[in-house]
A protein has these predicted regions:
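P-loop NTP-binding core
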Residues: 1-213
Length: 213
């Protein structure tokens, strides 16, 4: 895990324009660093409203450091507020996790509308990276119905690897550990390992195809 009492967090980057170098912390995992956030980020939604270029603040800071990394993943809150808009404006693509539950489908339309608006007004380069099915339980008809609907909606952009419901995945955060450290042999850890490999392969193939054009 990482120290939850860090002096700086993502809030300071967005609101106080602190450099990412002050916020980024190392982890036990090789080549993995993290920019933590905390409860103060919720207050950023209100403070951003009155700021100039409020949707661009994260992008402006990320441009200073992006060449230091192969990939930068932004874990967005479930709401479509200004923090999420900042994330979309700063991103090359969006990877959408979809829980295999009924209400997950309800929010997909609104999410896609928001991404389309961002593409039109704030970030014309943004694209859908893909959709990842999570909390999948093969025993339920509902989960299988959600899979069917998501594949119908996103077609070939749905990742083949699904993330199953798994007790170990639920337990790991409470111990401040990633699943690969908490229980690398669990179904959840193996699923995420396969998903990561599928993601890398997909991106490498796309980069190769782009280079050949």
């Amino acid at each position: 895990g990482i120290d939850k009492d860090n002096e700086y967090s993502l809030y300071d980057v967005l609101i106080n324009e602190e450099d990412f170098e002050k916020v980024i912390v190392s982890t036990k995992t090789k080549n993995l660093t993290v920019c933590p956030s905390n409860i103060s980020l919720a207050g950023a939604e209100v403070e951003l409203v009155s700021m100039m270029s409020r949707e661009q603040r994260l992008k402006e800071q990320l441009l200073k450091i992006k060449d230091q990394f192969d990939y930068i993943f932004i874990d967005c809150p479930p709401s479509l507020g200004l923090v999420t808009l900042n994330s979309f404006t700063a991103s090359d693509s969006v990877l959408i996790p979809v829980q295999c539950e009924y209400f997950a489908l309800e929010g997909l339309g609104q999410l896609m509308n928001t991404i389309n608006l961002v593409k039109k007004h704030l970030n014309k380069e943004i694209k859908i990276e893909g959709a990842v099915l999570t909390m999948y339980d093969i025993r339920t008809n509902l989960a299988n119905q959600v899979v069917k609907e998501v594949k119908k909606y996103f077609q070939d952009k749905v990742y083949k690897q699904v993330i199953p419901r798994n007790v170990k995945l639920s337990e790991a955060p409470s111990y401040g550990m990633p699943i690969v450290e908490y229980d690398a042999r669990s179904k959840g850890a193996k699923a995420y390992d396969k998903l990561a490999k599928e993601f890398l392969k997909k991106n490498e193939e796309e980069a190769k195809a782009k280079h050949l054009k």
